[in-house]
Amino acid sequence: MMEGMKGSELRRDSFDNYRQRYRRKGRSDQTWGAKLELLAKTIPDRLAFIQGGRRLTWKQFNGRVNRLANALLDLRIKKGERVGIAGFNSIEWMESFFAISKIGAVPFNINPLAALDEIEYMIGDADAVAVIMEDEYARTIARITTFIASLRHLIVYGRGELHQPLPEGALVYEDLLAEHSSTKPKLDYKVTNEDFCCLVYGSAKGAYTYPMGVVWDNAQGVKGVEWRFWNVLLPLLDRVQNNKIWTFLINLCPVRLFKLLKPVRSRSWAKWIIVTFIKMTRGSAFMVKQIAQGKQEETKSMPVSPLFYSATYMQTFTNIVACVTTTVFLSTTYPFNSRQLLETIEREKVDNIMINGDAFAMPIVDELKKAKEEGRTYDLVSWRGVISSGVRWSPRVKRELCQLLPQLVIVDTYGCTEFTPAYSSAAVLEDNDMPPVGATLRAKGGLYSIQAPFKVINRETGKEVEHGTGEMGEFVAEGYVALGYWKRPEETKKCFKVVGRRRHFFTGDDGYVDKHLRFCFVGKGGDVVSIGGEKVYGEEVKDVIKSHPKVRDAVVIGVPDEKLGEALVAVIELKEGEELAEQDVVEYCSQSLPSYKIPKHVMFVVSLPREATGKMEKRVLREFVESRLGSEAY
């Protein structure tokens, strides 16, 4: 029974309110601890992580994880208790996540650059007993968490070594490791697939000021992340006749069976063999050995966007457990430096990177162009692919990147913090059409249906929309789905529903299915702007504006309007050295949009406010728009 009700939010909550019962009760094969032990046992001497001059094999990494896990046990951290991780991408971030998971405690992500009240809220909302944090943010976090009653320990790490003074009473990460054994922690309980895996905080939604914690158990979270790769793989399998895509596929998952199928890769039965092989062997020691033996040198993946963002976290762990890749981190992960990225790809021979749309792709394009103008060259022959998720990636920027690096395969995925199956599209330079994220995702039939059904449901009728009619509906995901929102029973009931004995997540995103049976994402239902009774999605208008050759970035939001109820405001960042007038934007939009979708207000800024994840800082943006329009608009 949930207790401590306060409005729609609970003061206290328990994982028992979310716990699922599975047929194979008491198993532990789908836990992060089990996955790490498998890698350390099967390929102990393969490189696991690289950051700057530091290199760790799976055996070394597992030893450090065990030391931290034993330290956490000595600190009396119990199974099911929440432990936060605050920092940017680092080996220590990964060690912390695995160590917390090994003892059955629950890791949760903290964006260290979030507003202070938001950080305080997340730590308090999780009822955290400890926070493991990067030294740069330690003193600030220590100051704002003084009055959180549940918090017992602050543990501070540096990327390799400490660079900032410690807050009073904090523990030193490396000292804890030095004082504890590298042997596997001895538990007097079992961590099972049914247990609390992690709590993931995304962006604030709807009327909520702060983000909601998304509850995952191991069965859904670990297995779902493992399966995420095969959903990314699907559009690649559908186009294996393209040599670039085939090379990228073999490089990402170099199983010898796949190589043997190369001569017949255009035949449907060859693809069926690959899919069947994956379904039978995924996550096993046999599969790990197959991938490890398929390539003498490690396949190297680099998460560029932050790990505290769910899309990056999921894809990074997917690459580890499904592809057995070596993970490379930038030496300095924030602020993002595109030159450092390209130099690292060149030096470490990185195979693929993970980004969040235009916010990361545009600086990469700019640096490649600048290097070309200055006569500098990068040896990027190893770089085969870019996987993006979470933030829209415009067709124009995709094409520019492919023109600069013709060998690249672009994989653009659609997903949410609340479900792991990501539905993807693959693009190469030769493609005539490079759609934005969420478009041209295969909806029915073929290989795209082997994982989990994905539907578009008419909000009024409750039935699936008719394809090819333009009928709008809400995206609904089935398969590996989170269990609910922490301390938010009403939101959980609204968004997580059992339909036909299977759990579904109602995403709140709107779109339709075109005549080719492809999903077409239009916008988020919560961001719909009503103009004189007509529904307008800001994303649709933004895509048109961003296609203008002088525009670097843009965002479109709705504001109150006396006559029409709401009106559109376009906030635009121009390319360096370019000029554009408000009327130019209006005329450009009128060429492809009806009059009611044309922005009433156009504003130009030097740079748009984006979070470290690449997402727009909506609160800052709205404050700016309000100040420009005047408080009477609100």
Question: Residue spans of the language-model regions?
Answer:
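AMP-binding/adenylate-forming catalytic core of the ANL superfamily
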Residues: 114-121, 131-133, 346, 353, ...
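Conserved AMP-binding/adenylate-forming
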Residues: 54-55, 69-114, 304, 535
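Gly/Ser/Thr-rich phosphate-binding loop
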Residues: 171-174, 321-322, 342, 351-355, ...
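ATP-dependent adenylate-forming carboxylate-activation enzymes
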Residues: 87-88, 105-123, 135-140, 326-348, ...
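Conserved AMP-binding/adenylation subdomain of ANL enzymes
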Residues: 222-303, 310-354, 366-367, 371-372
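Structural core segment of the AMP-binding/adenylate-forming
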Residues: 2, 74-75, 102-175, 187, ...
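ANL superfamily adenylate-forming
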Residues: 13-14, 139-196, 218-225, 240-250, ...
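N-lobe entry segment of adenylate-forming
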Residues: 1-75, 79, 160-167, 185, ...
